[in-house]
Amino acid sequence: MATTDIISLVKNNLLYFQMWTEVEILQDDLSWKGNSLRLLRGRPPHKLSNDVDTEHENSLSSPRPLEFILPINMSQYKENFLTLECLSQTFTHLCSPSTERILLAIINDDGTIVYYFVYKGVRKPKRN
């Protein structure tokens, strides 16, 4: 699956199935192992997790923060394409400096998409 197809599939999933708003494909890209990585950015309809403790998220009147999404194909994931160095380069070159996490969108051959949080650095486990 081509990079543009992967990005379009994730964008449509976020907009029409997950009900995100303000989803856009960022123009900057990162060349990694012969592939081009591009991020999406968008606003989820609700808080995605309870581990980000910021004041503006507790306010009902303020919008949810924008999230960054990195779409990759399952075959790239299996081939050790996604390494710590790749993620570090993604945070450094494609995200804003204040970004603490990105959503990794892994697309299977059947079109299924799963989302995982990837944090910048080591994080203390959250309490339930």
UniProtKB/Swiss-Prot annotation:
Domain of life: Eukaryota
GO cellular component: endomembrane system; mitochondrial outer membrane; tRNA-intron endonuclease complex
Pfam families assigned: Sen15
Record's keyword terms, sorted: Membrane, Mitochondrion, Mitochondrion outer membrane, Nucleus, tRNA processing
MF terms (GO), sorted A to Z: nucleic acid binding
GO BP field: tRNA-type intron splice site recognition and cleavage
Subunit comment: tRNA splicing endonuclease is a heterotetramer composed of SEN2, SEN15, SEN34 and SEN54. Interacts directly with SEN34.
Matching PANTHER family: TRNA-SPLICING ENDONUCLEASE SUBUNIT SEN15 (PTHR28518:SF1)
Other comment: The tRNA splicing endonuclease complex is present with 100 molecules/cell.
Family that this chain belongs to: Belongs to the SEN15 family.
Protein name: tRNA-splicing endonuclease subunit SEN15
Source organism (scientific name): Saccharomyces cerevisiae (strain ATCC 204508 / S288c)
Lineage, uppermost ranks: Eukaryota, Fungi, Dikarya, Ascomycota, Saccharomycotina
